[in-house]
Design a protein with these regions (language model features):
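Aromatic- and acid-rich polysaccharide-binding/catalytic face
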Residues: 8-46, 69-70, 74-79, 91-93, ...
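Short Pro-Gly-centered flexible turn/kink motifs
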Residues: 272-284
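Alpha-helical scaffolding within the catalytic cores
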Residues: 2-14, 116, 191-193
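Active-site-proximal structural segments of metal-dependent nucleotidyl cyclase/transferase enzymes
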Residues: 52
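Aromatic/acidic polysaccharide-binding cleft in carbohydrate-active enzymes
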Residues: 70-195, 201-204
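Carbohydrate-binding surface patches
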Residues: 190-230, 236, 280-281
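Acidic, Ser/Thr/Pro-rich beta/coil linker or hinge segments at domain junctions
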Residues: 228-274
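Flexible loop/turn segments at secondary-structure boundaries
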Residues: 1-6, 28-34, 77-83, 137-143, ...
């Protein structure tokens, strides 16, 4: 938007003393059918967050304030599949009762994008204190239901969200990652591997979330865990598909996570094979 981030600065200068959060919304889509560029969408999300945080801190400094304004990322997801169908409904079939609008059916590559966005949100957990999927059932949602009281079923994007919710509790640890990079149609210096770790002190668990967003090559990830003495490998969960456009349905959920034997520990050093275009959850515990 032409007014971004001036609008945020202007409104915060008038409201700084009365508010605690700035609301952010962002949806992404693969309208150009360019998977490599689509999977760089989390870089845009990262820059979006950094810009809003910088704006909040600028206003804090200008106001000689004492408090940080944090972020509530109220809406985020992939959203584009249903656009044409929705246009047809509104233009050619208006005034229906409960028409099936915004019912995106998500592909496996959408699940990778959602996983990348989750990693980005966790990386910014110091300032992103709230983050919501605004719609949970049917409407750009991880869960779908069939008309007439039929089955409920899980979309591809359900699983990265499940993993982050279940295992992403605790303290987010910013990893120091050395990785090769690539360029896409609209992005430069895109990291081949995106990752973040979460330490749950109460349960003595460490979880690493990682996405290999290259489309051609497996990558070996080496993790130095010598500072986490006593931790052992629990499991390595993977989502990967040869067909990036594969979807789930009420008849068959083809895209599901699986447990693999691709991680091993040796003297505090863990090596993990990240398959091409894959979502990985590596769990460790004492």
């Amino acid at each position: 938007m032409p007014t971004f981030p001036k609008w945020e600065s202007t409104t915060l200068e008038s409201t700084y003393d009365y508010v605690d959060y700035v609301s952010m919304h962002q949806y992404y889509g693969n309208r150009d059918n360019d998977t490599a560029d689509f999977l760089a969408c989390s870089d845009d999300m990262d820059e979006f967050i950094r810009t809003v945080v910088a704006t909040c801190d600028y206003v804090k400094a200008k106001k000689r304030g004492k408090k940080d304004i944090n972020i509530s990322f109220d809406e985020w997801n992939v959203w584009f599949h249903s656009n044409a169908a929705d246009d047809d409904i509104t233009q050619n079939h208006p005034w229906q009762v409960a028409p099936p609008m915004l019912e995106d059916i998500y592909t496996f590559e959408d699940a990778l994008a959602v996983g990348l966005m989750l990693i980005t949100l966790l990386k910014h957990a110091d300032r992103v204190k709230i983050a919501c999927l605004a719609q949970l059932v049917n409407v750009i949602a991880p869960i779908m239901t069939d008309q007439g009281g039929g089955a409920a079923w899980k979309q591809t994007i359900f699983y990265p969200f499940l993993h982050a919710s279940k295992y992403g509790r605790g303290v987010a640890l910013m990893p120091l990652v050395q990785t090769t990079k690539h360029d896409t149609a609209k992005h430069e210096n895109v990291t081949d591997v995106e990752s973040v770790a979460v330490y749950n002190e109460e349960k003595e668990e460490l979880t690493i979330f990682a996405v290999n967003r290259t489309l051609e090559d497996d990558i070996e990830l080496t993790t130095d865990l010598r500072g986490m003495e006593g931790f052992h490998l629990v499991e390595h969960i993977v989502m990967e598909e040869s067909d990036l456009k594969l979807v789930n349905s009420s008849y068959e959920e083809k895209v599901v996570p699986k447990t693999v034997n691709r991680s091993k520990m040796d003297g505090g050093i863990m090596t993990t094979l990240l398959g091409k275009a894959s979502w990985n959850v590596i769990r460790l515990s004492k």
